[in-house]
């Protein structure tokens, strides 16, 4: 199997731009794709802010080395508004677009026709079954179609889940493990099950925290403090929910409830969360969630 050196990332949002950044830092040639100049510009901005942070830490006090590092990483990144053109030489295609199965399936059906035969296709979905997305491609591609699930903030979080469907070949799985290690992350593998490993455990825990609040058993602040100081979490469940996005949290659990593959008690909705989402309070990105960030 060919080494992964050329990567195309579809989606320039928080996750997509983070994946572009870590691949470019690992010296891969990366094309970042989105549908508008504004979306690509936003992705570039996220990368340059994060790169400055990484450079400052790597070359503390040496501005020249910091600049050389940033320039070298940025030189590995190309922007494109055409996914079809951008995959023409890709060893790996990673999709990080909206969590909509039809949109993802249409994208991959189109890319399957134009990408090189050896290209590995991956989705960074956190909530949709990989095999349902992969089924939109040819049988040959399904052997090269896996989940590659990064965590937010991508440049800082050290884990990648490689989600292996029954169709994925050993060679492809090995290539993805090698790529994950090359970009400085630790891979774990799991079957194509709801939430994979991290979200399967993390999301029900967070929802129970929301329901503790619904039942007025403890305050947001006290639950967060308890989990940080009593369980060693870097963020409490409400801080983390605001960080991930309340709409995302709701989308994941509503999807699981509909699928019916998870114990119903674990996917009980939370009134506090539902109310905030319906009022447009989605967490940090909208300025308010469980906490108010405008103050
Ligand atoms: N770019 C580059 N580096 C970053 C960064 C960024 N955007 N954000 C943080 N970092 C680095 C910092 O430079 C620092 O590095 P160091 O330890 O080597 O010095 C390290 O990360 C810690 O950052 P800070 O000291 O500035 O801040 P904190 O100690 O408060 O850490 C945090 C910030 C890493 C976000 C930490 O609070 C954390 O780990 N929170 C939990 C995040 C989490 O659980 N993410 C997973 C969410 S679930 C998910 O993504 C799945 C999805 O499918 C829903």
Language model features by range: what are they?
Residues 1-53, 114:
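NAD(P)+-binding Rossmann beta1-loop-alpha1 motif at the extreme N-terminus of oxidoreductases
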Residues 2-3, 26-28, 170, 174, ...:
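NAD(P)-dependent Rossmann-like dehydrogenase/reductase catalytic/cofactor-binding core
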Residues 5-7, 21, 25-27, 71-92, ...:
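Amphipathic alpha-helical segments at domain termini/boundaries
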Residues 25-28, 35, 153-162, 234, ...:
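Acidic/polar active-site rim loop that often engages polyanionic ligands
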Residues 31, 78-80, 94, 146-148, ...:
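Hydrophobic/aromatic beta-strand patches that form the interior of the parallel beta-sheet core
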Residues 38, 53-60, 65-121, 128:
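Rossmann-like NAD(P)-binding element
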Residues 120-191, 199-200:
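Rossmann-fold dinucleotide-binding core
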Residues 158-159, 205-209, 236, 252-256:
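A general alpha-helix detector
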